[in-house]
Amino acid sequence: MLHLLYGPAASGKTDLLMGRIRAAVAARTPGQVLLVPEQYSHEAERALCAACGDSLSLYAEVLSFTGLARRVAAETGAGDAPLLDQGGRLLCMALALDQVAPRLRLFGAAARRAQMQQTLLGAVDELKTACVTPDALEQTAARCPGYLGDKLRDLALVLAAYDAVTAQGHADPTDRLTHLAERIPESTLGHTGQFYLDGFTDYTRQELAVVRALLTAGADVTVCLTLDALTDGNEIFGTARHTARVLLDMADDCGVQTTVEACPARAADTPLRVLEQQLFSYTSAHFDDPAHTISVRTADDLTAECAWAASRALQLVQSGCRWRDIAIAARGFSDYAPALERMCAYYGVPLYFARRTDLLQKPLVALIRAAYDIVTGGWDAEDVSAYLRTGLAGLTPEETDTLENYVLLWSLRGGAWTRPEPWRQHPDGYGAPDTD
């Protein structure tokens, strides 16, 4: 059975799911599975543990689609083949291209180039995610004349050759969901489980194939979607609305009973909720907000946005607010970061970016890594520069700049750094007068 649960954001869909899982755990009903996106799994586990208590692990669990694939593979005894990492997949692609290069019409000349191999591997990933087979590509190519047909034939050959190579003892991670859909009929979890899908806006063809396999096997599947209405709703929910139609059509094709449940939007009793419901609506609404907690403004460009945000933060601090109580949220960090840093510096606003940083960029780690690179790389100038730029080499930034300029001027590398003799070249280059 397919249960479709929909409603706008903050309408209580997830709380309703948690309540149903909690009731099943209290009734000691095993096989409760909450399927969520990979990046949401830890947060969902914490929420479910808080809702269900210590007995959760006996009757329910939180999985992603890849986690479910590992679970079913272990149950059916099909998880022995080691998974290829990215390097192994590139090697398999190179081997596959070597085998079919003479037959390729468009890609043959560039088949040995690393960039082309990487590009074709990305194309294979997309084809597998969309459940496109080599036969389907061949059939489509037969109907497409000229360049497009040749390109599709080449892709069909590459995909078939890649599958043949990876079938020789190793598993491609992009095939996991395809194999999961095939193995669900052999799994007890597929027949007896109660599945709750939350946190998804839409599903790939591979994920839809898994949902179809669960429905066909007789599992109860509850899907949560964030949208306002199944028909004639707001256009911003178009993707989720299309997903709902696809799921309902799939259940109908499988001969599975469906139920649809709507979670109504909560009353617009706060300024933020009014803004949420009316921002993309073509109708107008009035809400009394004496405190003026929300204001909507427009700007000519991104820099003007950042300038207003920085000036507003400064104004709030001058009115008695603390810097740590002010946050600036932006849709895309890479787009806004340069302008935001520039404008905050202009207005004297201290700025801290709450973002993850690469561990290898930390000064101490970078120092150790650069030291190894220097030793193994023959004292290359770039490795030495990376070592000096960590700030832990005992030189000031000005001294580092002077040393780098000298090294670049005289192309010093290798043994020049390790010989006991001092450097005697003039810092100003050839032709400069000698000094003491």
Label every model-predicted segment.
Residues 1-436:
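Polyanion-engaging groove/track-forming segments
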